[in-house]
Amino acid sequence: MSNANEKQVGGNHYKVSGGRQHWDLIDDFNVGYLEGCFTKYVTRWMSKDGLKDLRKAEHFAQKLYEKRSAMNSVERCPNVPTFEIFQYASANRLGPAEFQLVEKMLTWKQPSDLLEVLRLLA
């Protein structure tokens, strides 16, 4: 049986040599769907659909902000350790701006923190 990480369907935008793939990071830390989709689009934007992917990321951040604000939620992202995010960003060749976006999305504590993510994308 082959390893799912060795198989890439539809391009190489997630294929990482020796590093952690996006789905591994999300699954390992039980990251929510909206945060996961956001980080997926930020990770791949330069190698797949460009600005369209950044707009998709923005859309997911907006939805997350709206849902959490409406709920007066104290729920937060599972707080992925910065070291893990750094390793992921390095393996996936993310630049400083992409690293900052992914880090903020994976460590937010209150809905107002998501506004900073949206400001960075504007």
Regions picked out by a protein language model, each given a short descriptive name:
Residues 1-122:
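Intrinsically disordered, low-complexity regulatory regions
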